[in-house]
A protein has these predicted regions:
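Terminal leader/tail segments of proteins
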Residues: 1-90
Length: 90
């Protein structure tokens, strides 16, 4: 797993690590949502309240983007019972 992805997964605050980043949101719905970015594009959105993980390559079908997405998918599959919604574009 990429070290920057591991760091993002461990973060409890908004933070960037090179081309990777994470930030948190609590919209009016009361859901706790964490966003993971790669080169400024949201590639993974986690709703901690509804236990869902939404993956998208944001139109960037590159090996590096897919590697980061696979790392997020692997971590959430192995460590949670969250529903994974994979919406990668080809």
């Amino acid at each position: 797993m990429l070290k920057s992805v591991e760091r993002c997964l461990e973060c409890k605050t908004d933070r960037s690590f090179g081309n990777h980043g994470t930030w948190w949101s609590m919209p009016c719905t009361g859901d706790i949502i964490q966003y993971f970015t790669y080169h400024g594009n949201v590639i993974c959105r986690v709703n901690w309240t509804q236990k869902t993980v939404y993956l998208t390559n944001s139109g960037w079908d590159t090996r590096s983007t897919n590697r980061a997405l696979n790392d997020y998918k692997h971590w959430f599959t192995e460590n949670t019972d969250f529903e994974i919604i994979d919406k990668r574009e080809n």
